[in-house]
């Protein structure tokens, strides 16, 4: 290789040859590691996979395939009371509305049937298991998935999947890496079965802080590294800002959901949703935000208008106006869905969070 021409080092100099070489390499990578292992970051780079809606139009759009991918593992993690279980139950409600069968493995023994019903979950048809230990939970999950009759299975949560040896041992016993090994072994088996049956598996996870981290994000998730690797989608869900208020009363929170990993569409998309206490995610607020981003609803300063009609000053009044007119809501929803089908995507990618995007 000469110093004057650094491209002599085995690199095709012609742009067409370089493009052909890249395409060949990408084809080889996909053959070796599966479709979705490498892709261009452009919005059109999506895999043709079936999905279950989350109930949020903007989150479905951010996920790139219309919701939680079927036949794959999705991890939903974040701090406490951020909306992780609410999001998982919302997915279950959408799957049931489409005629699907769902299961909820309640390792935390904390599922509230009344709250689940308020989110639209048909609790009479929901399969629920409250296992005694981590091995039992994952074995039940495997049997359900192998049946081929389950559309969505949720595990709440990974942190509560306590290994049998830890439960049977003495308080204070040191059992390093036991839960991580349990997760690694289970996920190796589950990945192939999920792909064959088309079941969407959702693992809810908690975050912990790594001791002694001076720089960067000190947060990490429980259960070792296996889930990070096997998950096709990882969603970071957390509260942001001040509580949403109606008068002087707090009625909800703003929740930020970020796709920190996505093997079925370009990752790093971020959306903000309104989580109302006792009611779940505000789908109308989400619709108004998305319609405004697409210029279907016009926004001039604090005023919102649709067509020639001014519908309110401020987002709350615009939402209240549309809520009183179901036919107007459906018209706006139809226009947003049509725009999505045409390929319009107002949700931009944002930088990743290094510590949790492994």
Curated annotation (Swiss-Prot):
<dbReference type="InterPro" id="IPR020584">
    <property type="entry name" value="DNA_recomb/repair_RecA_CS"/>
</dbReference>
<keyword id="KW-0742">SOS response</keyword>
<dbReference type="GO" id="GO:0005829">
    <property type="term" value="C:cytosol"/>
</dbReference>
<dbReference type="InterPro" id="IPR003593">
    <property type="entry name" value="AAA+_ATPase"/>
</dbReference>
<dbReference type="InterPro" id="IPR027417">
    <property type="entry name" value="P-loop_NTPase"/>
</dbReference>
<feature type="binding site">
    <location>
        <begin position="78"/>
        <end position="85"/>
    </location>
    <ligand>
        <name>ATP</name>
    </ligand>
</feature>
<comment type="similarity">
    <text>Belongs to the RecA family.</text>
</comment>
<dbReference type="InterPro" id="IPR049261">
    <property type="entry name" value="RecA-like_C"/>
</dbReference>
<dbReference type="GO" id="GO:0016887">
    <property type="term" value="F:ATP hydrolysis activity"/>
</dbReference>
<dbReference type="InterPro" id="IPR020588">
    <property type="entry name" value="RecA_ATP-bd"/>
</dbReference>
<dbReference type="GO" id="GO:0003697">
    <property type="term" value="F:single-stranded DNA binding"/>
</dbReference>
<keyword id="KW-0233">DNA recombination</keyword>
<keyword id="KW-0227">DNA damage</keyword>
<dbReference type="GO" id="GO:0005524">
    <property type="term" value="F:ATP binding"/>
</dbReference>
<dbReference type="GO" id="GO:0006310">
    <property type="term" value="P:DNA recombination"/>
</dbReference>
<dbReference type="GO" id="GO:0003684">
    <property type="term" value="F:damaged DNA binding"/>
</dbReference>
<protein>
    <recommendedName>
        <fullName>Protein RecA</fullName>
    </recommendedName>
</protein>
<dbReference type="Pfam" id="PF00154">
    <property type="entry name" value="RecA"/>
</dbReference>
<keyword id="KW-0963">Cytoplasm</keyword>
<keyword id="KW-0238">DNA-binding</keyword>
<dbReference type="GO" id="GO:0140664">
    <property type="term" value="F:ATP-dependent DNA damage sensor activity"/>
</dbReference>
<keyword id="KW-0067">ATP-binding</keyword>
<comment type="function">
    <text>Can catalyze the hydrolysis of ATP in the presence of single-stranded DNA, the ATP-dependent uptake of single-stranded DNA by duplex DNA, and the ATP-dependent hybridization of homologous single-stranded DNAs. It interacts with LexA causing its activation and leading to its autocatalytic cleavage.</text>
</comment>
<dbReference type="GO" id="GO:0017116">
    <property type="term" value="F:single-stranded DNA helicase activity"/>
</dbReference>
<dbReference type="InterPro" id="IPR023400">
    <property type="entry name" value="RecA_C_sf"/>
</dbReference>
<dbReference type="GO" id="GO:0006281">
    <property type="term" value="P:DNA repair"/>
</dbReference>
<dbReference type="InterPro" id="IPR013765">
    <property type="entry name" value="DNA_recomb/repair_RecA"/>
</dbReference>
<dbReference type="Pfam" id="PF21096">
    <property type="entry name" value="RecA_C"/>
</dbReference>
<keyword id="KW-0234">DNA repair</keyword>
<dbReference type="InterPro" id="IPR049428">
    <property type="entry name" value="RecA-like_N"/>
</dbReference>
<keyword id="KW-0547">Nucleotide-binding</keyword>
<dbReference type="InterPro" id="IPR020587">
    <property type="entry name" value="RecA_monomer-monomer_interface"/>
</dbReference>
<dbReference type="GO" id="GO:0009432">
    <property type="term" value="P:SOS response"/>
</dbReference>
């Amino acid at each position: 290789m000469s110093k004057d021409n650094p491209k002599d080092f085995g690199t095709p100099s012609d742009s067409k040859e370089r493009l052909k070489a890249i395409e060949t390499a990408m084809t080889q990578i996909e053959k070796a590691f599966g479709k979705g292992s490498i892709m261009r970051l452009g919005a059109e780079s999506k895999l043709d996979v079936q999905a279950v809606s989350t109930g949020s139009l903007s989150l479905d759009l951010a996920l790139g395939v219309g919701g939680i991918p079927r036949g794959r593992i999705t991890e939903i993690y974040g701090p406490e009371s951020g909306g992780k279980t609410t999001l998982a139950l919302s997915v279950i409600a959408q799957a049931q509305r489409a005629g699907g069968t769902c299961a909820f493995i309640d390792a935390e023994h904390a599922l509230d049937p009344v709250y689940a019903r308020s989110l639209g979950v048909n609790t009479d048809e929901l399969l629920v298991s409250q296992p005694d230990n981590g091995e039992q939970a994952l074995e039940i999950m495997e049997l359900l998935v192998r049946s081929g009759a389950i559309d969505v299975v949720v595990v709440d949560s990974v942190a509560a999947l306590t290994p049998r040896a830890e439960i049977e041992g003495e308080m204070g016993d040191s059992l390093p890496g036991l839960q991580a090994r349990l997760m690694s072994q289970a996920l190796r088996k589950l990945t192939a079965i999920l792909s064959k049956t088309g079941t969407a598996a959702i693992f809810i996870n908690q975050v912990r802080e790594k001791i002694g981290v001076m720089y960067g994000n000190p947060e990490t998730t429980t259960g070792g590294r296996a889930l990070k690797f096997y998950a096709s989608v990882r969603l970071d869900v957390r509260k942001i800002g001040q509580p949403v208020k109606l008068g002087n009363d707090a009625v909800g929170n703003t929740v930020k959901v970020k796709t920190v990993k996505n093997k079925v569409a370009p990752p790093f998309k971020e959306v903000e949703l309104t989580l109302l206490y006792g009611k779940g995610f505000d789908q109308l607020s989400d619709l108004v935000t998305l319609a405004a981003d697409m210029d279907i609803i016009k926004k001039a300063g604090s005023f919102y208008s649709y067509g020639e009609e001014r519908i309110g000053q401020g987002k709350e009044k615009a939402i209240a106006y549309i809520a009183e007119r179901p036919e107007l809501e459906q018209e706006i929803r139809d226009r947003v869905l049509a725009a999505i089908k045409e390929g319009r995507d107002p949700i931009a990618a944002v930088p990743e969070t290094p510590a949790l995007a492994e």
